[in-house]
């Protein structure tokens, strides 16, 4: 992305990137030590596994791992002029009193994140184009592009959800006079917003933030608590047994002697988060067209005024003729 920074801003940006990199490496290392694949959180996995975050069907790929559906909202201007900075506000609502299951089975606050898919030509606004007022609204949020050649797709998160249920994206509109691939008109914007951990890792393995089901039909023979969760033993009709291991997090809802069908729930659903996506539209408006519309309405108003004046003039002439 072509950004223009002052020396102080550049040093500040490099320091911020270094801090983010150090924190990310530390979190990834700690998460891997605590539990395998615990660091498999979007948006990093989406970037590594998908060329685009939106499938041909229109589904944003985050929904492949975050199975629960939750609302997501977005606010953008109806129309913008070329080479103009505006804000897109993504809202990710949830009950702040909710706590999610963490990788080790304990409870903690929810994290949030979002993906903003802008039309081609639109991109994250350079720092020197963002007003101080807008910077205050954005806060200390770090944005990244989905890839080096996709400046119009912006990612953010994971972030602490309690402080970021509304995320403000600073966006710069393109100028068709400078970019011949951009045209004035109406465009679509695609938005995805997530709160909480996923239920499935990109590898297909379940996380501990979802329902665990019976691998076979039969009768519950034992429910044993272990250091890592629970072992639930099912005795099948032929007398053989199968053990379903449940990690720390979900709680068993079956008891010894209960009959279960294959695929029936053995645990509750600890997930309190979910993913939602929404589409909206924005118009890249020509300033000449705006001036043309203003001129048209001015001409219409002027014509109406002239008609009223003409009508009054005719009425005066008619009244004078009657008096004569």
Curated annotation (Swiss-Prot):
Query: What membrane topology is given?
Result: Single-pass membrane protein
This molecule's function is given as: Component of the cytochrome b6-f complex, which mediates electron transfer between photosystem II (PSII) and photosystem I (PSI), cyclic electron flow around PSI, and state transitions.
Q: Which residues cross the membrane?
A: 290-310
Q: Where does heme bind?
A: 42, 62, 65-66
Paired cysteines (S-S): none
- Xref: PANTHER family: CYTOCHROME F (PTHR33288:SF10), PTHR33288
GO terms of biological process kind:
photosynthesis
Put simply, this protein is called: Cytochrome f
On cofactor binding, the record's note says: Binds 1 heme group covalently.
- Record InterPro entries: Cyt-f_TM, Cyt_f, Cyt_f_lg_dom, Cyt_f_lg_dom_sf, Rudment_hybrid_motif
Cofactor requirement: heme
Q: Where does the protein end up?
A: Cellular thylakoid membrane
Chief location = membrane
> Which PROSITE patterns does the record match to this protein?
CYTF
Q: What is the scientific name of the source organism?
A: Synechococcus elongatus (strain ATCC 33912 / PCC 7942 / FACHB-805) (Anacystis nidulans R2)
> Which of UniProt's keywords are assigned here?
Electron transport, Heme, Iron, Membrane, Metal-binding, Photosynthesis, Signal, Thylakoid, Transmembrane, Transmembrane helix, Transport
Subunit structure, per the record?
Answer: The 4 large subunits of the cytochrome b6-f complex are cytochrome b6, subunit IV (17 kDa polypeptide, PetD), cytochrome f and the Rieske protein, while the 4 small subunits are PetG, PetL, PetM and PetN. The complex functions as a dimer.
Which GO CC annotations does the UniProt entry carry?
plasma membrane-derived thylakoid membrane
Matches recorded under Pfam families: Apocytochr_F_C (PF01333), Apocytochr_F_N (PF16639)
Cite the GO molecular-function annotations of the record.
electron transfer activity; heme binding; iron ion binding
Which residues, if any, are the signal sequence? Answer: 1-30
What the record says about family reads: Belongs to the cytochrome f family.
